[in-house]
Amino acid sequence: MLAARGQWVLIGGMNPSLNLFLIGPTGAGKTTLGAWLAPRLSLPCVDLDRVIEAQAGQPVREIFAHEGEASFRARESAALLEHSTHAGVLLVCGGGIVTHADNRAWLRQRGFVLWLRVSAPTRARRLADDATRPLLAGDDLLARLQQLDAARAIWYRECADAVLDETTDENIDALGARALALLHVHWRRGAAITGAPA
């Protein structure tokens, strides 16, 4: 089922699961939406970037600088596996988690995947003064966001069960209410989930 931009798009139909995964690009507002949804769904909220930072003892940008992106992605995959193995969690995923095929498969198997989609210009305004995003370094932030969107959109769509489009001026209460309405209709929460892949 499709709906107008600013509403939502259902991609994969019902996905029985006890877990909810938020995916989307940097600056989409996943952390904010996750914090809003978690108490209303009675789920613990786990932000994978914060988990990785706690385990590494340094911020994401320093992990990228000292260890490289490949090391960060390995940490990210391990954190995803660890925190989605048990049922009943809301996971806020980093923007690049979809770059690995194994992560995309695991997301599809272990939870209902909601893609928070926000335009690059809107995200560029939000991130203009944010120096913590290692893949956004450079002079042309908007161009970099558009480049990442072009590369990753197909992967977001591959593992998403539904898409929530955010409008430019929407506050978190309005966005959260739309997310809850979508989940109420299309998330068969409480059904059995699949086990770990062989």
Name what the model sees in each region.
Residues 47-108, 132-133, 146:
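ATP-dependent small-molecule kinase phosphotransfer cores
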Residues 109-154:
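A glycine- and Lys/Arg-enriched "phosphate-lid" helix/loop adjacent to the NTP-binding pocket
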Residues 33:
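Hydrophobic positions on the alpha1 helix immediately C-terminal to the Walker A/P-loop
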Residues 30:
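Conserved lysine of the Walker
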Residues 25:
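P-loop (Walker A) phosphate-binding loop of NTP-binding proteins
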Residues 22:
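Hydrophobic anchor at the beta1->P-loop junction of P-loop NTPases
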Residues 8-15, 36, 40, 112, ...:
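NTP-dependent small-molecule kinase module
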Residues 39-48:
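Post-Walker A helix-loop "phosphate-sensing" segment adjacent to the P-loop in P-loop NTPases
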